[in-house]
């Protein structure tokens, strides 16, 4: 039996020799240099390292995004056969929130405390007009079930401060 790594069609993310620099004190400094990784459909990947090692920068880069004051200086990021470093901002934005998402370390900081979870879950899909609000809400509840959130039919009506950090992270993933 072949593993998923033997089947190229299962390759979801292929980061090849990616390098990123940040601008500080009038010069560019390397932040990430020559990183390679592959992620296959169905796999889970965790990045572990010291504070300031570049984990968040690499996570954002995997979406084709670099922070203000940073730049890609080499390599490629292939997602579903497309090199994100070569796509226009418009094309990348079409992927963000629909095919690609980023779960921040501090999930609470990513949520608006004044809005219910369900509205924040569907916000990106609604802004891209992917479906009606009602359909997207039903889809969100189904995702809550798949993420094994408690009371998936009601949890979306809660505000971020009313759920745990782990539940917020799973909500972000949904």
Residue locations for each model-derived region?
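ABC transporter nucleotide-binding domains
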Residues: 1-174
